[in-house]
């Protein structure tokens, strides 16, 4: 079965990191690994550059700031979003509504396998509207999302 084409080529990708991801590398490394957020962003930037894709990234511990950044993405011509909503995955109708409101396709990413964790982490308010969900691959899940975007929807 062929993937549903997305009208716009993915020349511009926004990566959104939710709450507490600024603590990566030191926060519960047995769950989230030792890789820092700066390391993840650098790996993504290198992969994006090699693929001819413009990449921006943003992290916030505040739901409203993430909503504002999603809304701004529309006027910036962002073609695709990679989002790790972190704890907001399980609570935020606001993020879901913002993503629906801008109608930019997105992939949801989680470092850990949320389905092997506490039951409250099994539900996502974003997953049913996402192009895909990647979880449990550690920081490499972000690269998998970017690789999918480039391979299926075009680079620069």
Curated annotation (Swiss-Prot):
Reactions the enzyme catalyzes: 3-dehydroquinate = 3-dehydroshikimate + H2O
A GO molecular function held by the record: 3-dehydroquinate dehydratase activity
UniProt site (Transition state stabilizer): 27
Keywords, sorted A to Z: Amino-acid biosynthesis, Aromatic amino acid biosynthesis, Lyase
One annotated GO biological process: aromatic amino acid family biosynthetic process
Subunit composition and interactions: Homododecamer.
SUPFAM superfamilies found in the cross-reference section: Type II 3-dehydroquinate dehydratase
Record protein name field: 3-dehydroquinate dehydratase 1
Keyword Secreted: no
Active site residues of this protein: 32, 110
């Amino acid at each position: 079965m062929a993937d549903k084409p997305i009208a716009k080529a993915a020349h511009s990708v926004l990566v959104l990191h939710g709450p507490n991801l600024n603590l990566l590398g030191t926060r519960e490394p047995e769950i989230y690994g030792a890789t820092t957020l700066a390391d993840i962003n650098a790996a993504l930037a290198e992969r994006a550059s090699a693929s001819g894709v413009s990449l921006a990234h943003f992290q916030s511990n505040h739901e409203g700031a993430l909503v504002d950044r999603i809304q701004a993405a529309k006027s910036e011509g962002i073609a695709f979003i990679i989002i790790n909503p972190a704890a907001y995955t399980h609570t935020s109708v606001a993020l879901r509504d913002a993503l629906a409101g801008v109608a930019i396709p997105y992939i949801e990413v989680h470092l850990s396998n949320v389905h092997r964790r506490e039951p409250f982490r099994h539900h996502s308010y974003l997953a049913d509207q996402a192009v895909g969900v990647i979880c449990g691959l550690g920081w490499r899940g972000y690269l998998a999302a970017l690789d999918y975007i480039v391979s299926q929807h075009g680079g620069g």
